[in-house]
Amino acid sequence: MRVLLSNDDGFHANGIKALKEIVIKSGIASEIWVVAPLNNCSGSGRSVGLNVKVQVSKVSDTEFIVDSTPSTSVFLALRKIMNYKPDLILSGINHGVNIGNDVWYSGTVAAAAEGAAINIPSIAISQEYDNKSGEINWVNPQRFLKQIIEMLVNVSFWNKSTVMNVNFPLMPAKGIKFTDQGKYVPCNEIEKNESSDDSNVSYTITRITPNKKNRAQCDGSIKAIDEGYITITPLKFDMTDFDVLTSLNSLK
């Protein structure tokens, strides 16, 4: 199996290194490619570098650094960089979960979505970390990811235009739950940077996902992660609200 790895934390991030090590040890891949952004692109969503020159640097015959977004990285990998399309795309392991509204912002999910757009099985993988210390470990992915990948690639009813979004909890995992995405109200952690010019002010958005205390009433993947479960959520990218569409059509 030819596997393409990408992410949104950047080519040199620890998460994608951990992912590659897991894939190698699992023996599921006969060929591993890594095509990932030069820099951290967290929160970039599905932005693509249109009408700009994108520098691609070759690290080895199967490793490339793209000076652009996660979506651009995979877009180019599938059309210009790789000699053959991959059998599977794995995006991650992201430093932080992608649950609830996160999927709208996530470059990790976006990288996987580029594969799903042309019906390549694609999995986004994210790991919760300690908000206070910033520490992260890969124990849960190391223990469970091989099993999850093997299970998913053998699902006969998986519509390959659907991204499988996998999130690992910080605590030792209690098991796996298949969940809906869920939703939350974004938090307001924004820092105003010091400036002597009131007409030219800068801000830093430090956090979007609410902490556990402020998401206690949330459901779906948010609740399951907070309970200590690995979550798997199938995501499709036709975002039409068909109930509202039906109602709108009744206005004719």
UniProtKB/Swiss-Prot annotation:
Reactions catalysed according to its record: a ribonucleoside 5'-phosphate + H2O = a ribonucleoside + phosphate
Keywords, ordered alphabetically: Cytoplasm, Hydrolase, Metal-binding, Nucleotide-binding
Entry's Gene Ontology molecular function annotations: 3'-nucleotidase activity; 5'-nucleotidase activity; exopolyphosphatase activity; metal ion binding; nucleotide binding
Keyword Hydrolase: yes
Compartments reported by the entry: Cytoplasm
Protein's UniProt keywords contain Cytoplasm: yes
Binding positions for a divalent metal cation per the UniProt entry: 8-9, 42, 94
EC number(s) recorded for this UniProt protein: 3.1.3.5
CC terms in the record's Gene Ontology section: cytoplasm
Cofactor, how bound (note): Binds 1 divalent metal cation per subunit.
Entries under InterPro entries matching the protein: SurE (IPR030048), SurE-like_Pase/nucleotidase (IPR002828), SurE-like_sf (IPR036523)
Cofactors that this protein relies on: a divalent metal cation
Family that this chain belongs to: Belongs to the SurE nucleotidase family.
NCBIfam families cross-referenced by the UniProt entry: surE (TIGR00087)
HAMAP family: SurE
Function: Nucleotidase that shows phosphatase activity on nucleoside 5'-monophosphates.
Name of the protein in its database record: 5'-nucleotidase SurE
Organism (species): Ehrlichia ruminantium (strain Gardel)
Gene name linked to the record: surE
